[in-house]
């Protein structure tokens, strides 16, 4: 919820934060636009015209924006746990009738009850690695029930090379990531911490920041990272008939599962 009366002010603030978010994310994802293009291309190739798309852990709406721009008949429902990101998304896209944003917490086994399916496509980008393995497994089974017949699930994320059996690949990938980040941050792009600091200090979102701090209070530590093979096996077990990688740059993949 915005803390100002003028929605135009909130929209301008949200647009600026969204731009800074996108720049910050590109520092971590060198070919983010290609990742997004792959996702939108696969939706267009696999689903019918005018697809209904669910964006998991949508953040401030960047992937949803790419989808509706690439697919004029598409509509996107974005779900996220974070009230600050949702507030920014709702303000940034308040005039976009083909996008809506819903609060949902994947740690809650009943999260999908807040979502009216089915969907032609379910997507996510740089988000699901935050989930604990048991939550991710349950989520993939939920997605298999939410997506319609011949529907598609697409997840763009970094799937790390194994440091023991793929040591060289992991080393050169980390060197590449460091080089890209150093260049971006050196030219003034927000760091991850810097973006959040700027967003939380924005008066427009004071209420959302308070809510965010309550939600994330006591939540510390990163989830163990599952290898890409494990992701694909879970999706097979969940009932998807075809699974595989449809795009890759080093450890950055778009994995695809067709129902």
Tell me the role of every PLM-derived stretch:
Residues 1-47, 62-66, 154-191:
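Conserved class I S-adenosyl-L-methionine
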Residues 54, 62-109:
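Class I SAM-dependent methyltransferase SAM/SAH-binding core
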Residues 59:
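Conserved glycine-rich SAM-binding loop
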Residues 123:
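A conserved beta-strand element that flanks and buttresses the S-adenosyl-L-methionine
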Residues 137-149:
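A short glycine-rich, Lys/Arg-flanked "PGG" loop and its adjoining helix->strand segment in the class I
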Residues 223-238:
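Short alpha-helix
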Residues 238-259:
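Core SAM-dependent methyltransferase catalytic element
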